[in-house]
Every structure is written in structure tokens, then in C-alpha cells.
Amino acid sequence: MKEPTTEIEIETSAVATILPPPLPPTASPHQALVERLKDYGQEDVFSLWDELSPEERDLLLRDIENLDLPRIDRIIRCSLHSQGLPVAAIEPVPENCVSTVEERTKEDREKWWKMGLKAIYEGKLGVVLLSGGQGTRLGSSDPKGCYNIGLPSGKSLFQIQAERILCVQRLASQAMSEASPTRPVTIQWYIMTSPFTHEPTQKFFKSHKYFGLEPDQVTFFQQGTLPCISKDGKFIMETPFSLSKAPDGNGGVYTALKSSRLLEDMASRGIKYVDCYGVDNVLVRVADPTFLGYFIDKSAASAAKVVRKAYPQEKVGVFVRRGKGGPLTVVEYTELDQSMASATNQQTGRLQYCWSNVCLHMFTLDFLNQVANGLEKDSVYHLAEKKIPSINGDIVGLKLEQFIFDCFPYAPSTALFEVLREEEFAPVKNANGSNYDTPESARLLVLRLHTRWVIAAGGFLTHSVPLYATGVEVSPLCSYAGENLEAICRGRTFHAPCEISL
């Protein structure tokens, strides 16, 4: 007998009622960033989002995601707010803070030279080169250090500076050979580039085999960039999918050294002192033993070489004391009215505000660590009004910058060391044909100085053009500051222009 069967009907509507409800749509990365940017009043960067291709949208998202928005917002707000605020009055630098050329004795110079060479021999000096700029004003898109100013040797600024390091290393090794076994001396060279100069600078050094230096004694690191802003603090868009950015000034070196962990690298190598300078001075005495010895002797936290202003209205920044008994710092020439710029010291006859900043500095490593931490917390940047590339063409906007001299207010002690302009300061900033700081003016300063060295060493010159327009070039591999030239020059005649080399 057939068993009865039971059919069970399942209503589909009943099944549907037990399914979980659909999830709400997830916010797109674009929408999430818009909400974040609203917190900082910068959501306009997405105003052209609907017109962008998928690839362009990805580029814009990456550009924004790479920003430290809280930090940048703090910098913008604090920097804009600081405009127009009263600042402490300035005073002239006290006389006892400056070692002048005329008061320096031969014994002082010899003592400091030996002290500096000893510290270099012991590996206590590192050198930082500020080399983020391009040679745009010189008519070149290459890093400025690649520039050849037209010396007889045809050497670039980078090569001249590298060879000065080689010379100092040799001098330190020779000076200490009597007291210690002769051994190679190595000065670590840290070169700060920018996003525009980093790769070409590295390629230039590699193609020239590091100019005789060991590759592992040269370290390249990049300074940071910050968005360019309008006068009301809004980001400027260079294209519909990218922000307009600019390097954060040569004072960005402090943050860059910290973020690259190079301050730790220096400490691990036993470096105690750091020489810091700009690339565009062809007469710079890199790793100057005398300056280093003076710095050590004074037990200062920071020091700077200074030159006297050529005339009261010269457009240079000068060292001052900020506030009654306050720290030494640098002010731009625009902060000095005509009466202050022309005021003289009744005792010395010098201008009261005469000590020009020429970006030749020395720091202890301990102080650099303090500065890197201090400037990271100090969100007030200099606002430089510039033409900024934008989607509407070049517009007037603001670049956010720190300057190398922003460190000095943090220093418990700063010592100033006067040098002669004609011996140590030949800037290369403007194209030939300009009124000052050209490759031609720098070339002549080098030739004239080196000609004096050769004549002092017993050499003679012949020349087909007036001597004021020519001269000789002494290779840094022969002499650092005019020393040890007698064996090469005495009784010999050189036809200018030429290079004297080993």
C-alpha cells in the first residue's frame, strides 16, 4: 500500500524576510578627503573633481593624502596671524660677541688652526651643504652646484668644494702624523637637495666619481616642500589635479636632517660639530680649521662668519640682538630704517649694524638636535610673496619658508667671526650682465685672491690683458688658503689666466 506523502510548501516571501538588510554604501576616498579638508577650509581643491579622468583623480588623491594636514594647517594659521604683530626692538651686536680681523693675533690664528685640524683628524666635524636651488637666474635648469663660472680649470662649484674637503683631510692627516700614526682622515659631507635637484645632483656626482671623495662619505638628502597658498590661506592648485608646492626654504635643513635620521647618523660617527654653508659661494672655505678651532675655543652652541657691510644701505641681512639682553639673530635690511642703517659706533667708527650674514655657520650637534625639535614646534614660517604657477596662470601668492638663521634665537650662545669679503665671499646668484653677484664677478674675485697667494709665495705673472681682468687659479688640491705654495711658485713665472695644479 502506497504511503501517503506530505508536501511542504515554502513561501519565498518568508525566506526574504530573514535576509540581513543591505549595508549602506561606503564613502569613497574622495568623499572622505573632502570631509577632512572641510575641517581646514581647503575643500576647494576638489572643485574640478567631476572634470578629471580616473588617472587624474588618483593623482589628486595621492597628492592630498601625502600631506600632513594638521601640521600644514597650523603653519598657515600661525604664519598668517604673526603678520603685523609687534616684535621686540633690536640692538647692535655687542662688541665682545665678534672676533674681528684686526684684533686677531698670529698666535690666535695658529692655535685655532691646530685645534681645528685635531678635531677634524679625530672625526668630530661633519659638513652640511645647502644645495636645493637650481641655476635658473644663471640661465640653467641644472642644480646650481653644477655651474661652471668660467675659471681656467672649468671646474664646477661642486668640484671646487669637494677638492677643498680633500685638501683639509690631507692637511689634518699631515698635521697629526707627528703625534699619531698617519691614517686617512674622512669628513662626512651631507648634501641637502630639493625635489628639483635631487636626482640630477646624484647623477652629477656619480658621473664625476665623487671628485675623488669616497662615495660613502657623501650623503644626499631632500628638504621638504609645502603647499603654496593665497593671501587668505587657501591652497593654490597648479593643475586641476595637483597642488602648487615649493621647497620649505634653506631653514628646512633642520627638519630634513631629523626626519632623514641624519642627526642620529652623525652621532653614531662621533661627529660633534657641523659646518653648514650655501652652495653658491665660490670662495667658501669648507670645513675651515681656523673657524672650527675658534668655535671650539669659545665653547659656543652656534657661530657664524660675518663680513662688514660695504655701505649703509647694502641690501643684506645683518646680525642684531633682539630685545634687551636677548639672543643674537638676523634681520632683513628692510627692518632697518635709514637712520638705523647709517648709525655709527662712536668708539669704533663702524656702522652699528654692520655684521652681514653670509650663510657660513657652525653648530654643535647637540644644538642642532635642539633646533630641529624647537622649529618643529614653532609653526611661524616666513611668508614670501611670489608669482605662483596656477590653473589660472601665474598669480601672486605666498610661499612658506624657514631660513637657516631661524636657529639663532634658540642658541644659548652665538659667536661671530669676521672674515674678509675678498677672501671668503664670492656669491654666484645672478646672470652675467647684472650689477652684482655674477659668475664673472665671482671669477675675478677668485683670480685676484689666488694671484695674491702666488705673488706672496715668490711667483711671477705675465699677462696679455690688464691684471685687474685676469689672474691665476690655484687648485684646492694645492692649497686651501694660500699655504704650502712656495715649493710650487717660488721663482716661477705663470702666464695668466691659468690654473696652478699638482
UniProtKB/Swiss-Prot annotation:
Positions bound to substrate: N250, K429
Domain of life of the organism encoding this protein: Eukaryota
Pathway where it operates: Nucleotide-sugar biosynthesis; UDP-N-acetyl-alpha-D-glucosamine biosynthesis; UDP-N-acetyl-alpha-D-glucosamine from N-acetyl-alpha-D-glucosamine 1-phosphate: step 1/1
GO annotations of cellular component type: cytoplasm
GO molecular function, one term: UTP:glucose-1-phosphate uridylyltransferase activity
Tissue distribution of the protein: Expressed in root tips, stipules, lateral root primordia, immature anthers and at the branching points of the flowering shoots.
Cofactors, names only: Mg(2+); Mn(2+)
Catalytic activity: N-acetyl-alpha-D-glucosamine 1-phosphate + UTP + H(+) = UDP-N-acetyl-alpha-D-glucosamine + diphosphate; N-acetyl-alpha-D-galactosamine 1-phosphate + UTP + H(+) = UDP-N-acetyl-alpha-D-galactosamine + diphosphate; alpha-D-glucose 1-phosphate + UTP + H(+) = UDP-alpha-D-glucose + diphosphate
GO biological process, one term: UDP-alpha-D-glucose metabolic process
This enzyme's EC code(s): 2.7.7.23, 2.7.7.83, 2.7.7.9
Motif (Substrate binding): 130-133, 332-333
Localization (cell): Cytoplasm
Predominant place of localization: cytoplasm
Disruption phenotype: No visible phenotype under normal growth conditions, but the double mutants glcnac1put1 and glcnac1put2 are lethal.
Keywords from the UniProt entry: Cytoplasm, Nucleotidyltransferase, Transferase
Record carries keyword Glycosyltransferase: no
Keyword Membrane listed: no
Function of the molecule: Uridylyltransferase involved in the biosynthesis of UDP-glucosamine, an essential precursor for glycoprotein and glycolipid synthesis. Can use UDP-glucosamine, the 4-epimer UDP-galactosamine and UDP-glucose as substrates. Acts redundantly with GLCNAC1PUT1. Required for gametogenesis and embryo development.
Entry-linked PANTHER family: LD24639P, UDP- GLUCOSE PYROPHOSPHORYLASE
Family: Belongs to the UDPGP type 1 family.
Known partners and oligomeric status: Monomer.
Protein name: UDP-N-acetylglucosamine diphosphorylase 2
Species the sequence originates in: Arabidopsis thaliana
Encoding gene, per UniProt annotation: GLCNAC1PUT2
